[in-house]
Amino acid sequence: INKKVNNINQEKLSKLETPLVCFKAQVKKEDKRIKDEELDSWIRSLNILEELNIKIGARIIFCVNNWDKNYYNGEQGIIEDILYEEEKIYISIIKNNGMKILLEPYTFFMEELEQSGKDFVVNILASVTQFPIKLAYAITIHKSQGMSIEKLVCDIDHIFENGQLYVALSRATNPNTLKIYSTKKINFGFYFANILKIDSNVIEFYK
């Protein structure tokens, strides 16, 4: 599924005639006790890319909430420009609602709480800095959790877990712009009913 998503995104990106720009995540290990495997696992758990490839004109989706900067997880937009000012880089994005923002890299911190007497101290173990966006032509159901998507085309060919269909369809904020897509060569109604998996514990609870 990830391969299919990546292929769609790269295919759409390749059709843009603007130059390709790559941003690599900047990782800093502040505590030498942290093992590389532990650090890698933490980075993979974040909703960002270690290597972000974009072009001006690309459709993107925001991957975190940043109330102060006026962008939210699941919002979409188009890259208008990439600006280099002294030692800073900004990505100019026009969101679907028409608002224009200058996006800066976002820093995630790996932290632990340490008790010091009666107080607790926050220790920073590591950090990773990256632009919190991804290409938005396609995304997996798992990665879409928590997002609100305005225009959604949902491919239901690979539904296999309880509640997965609900997670996928409930991302849509507007039923009028929701499209359900399947390439299965069987009756759609039969297939849809078959993948509408409900956990037995939920059924038992509502009896």
What are these regions, as identified by a protein language model?
Residues 1-207:
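RecA-like helicase/translocase P-loop NTPase motor core
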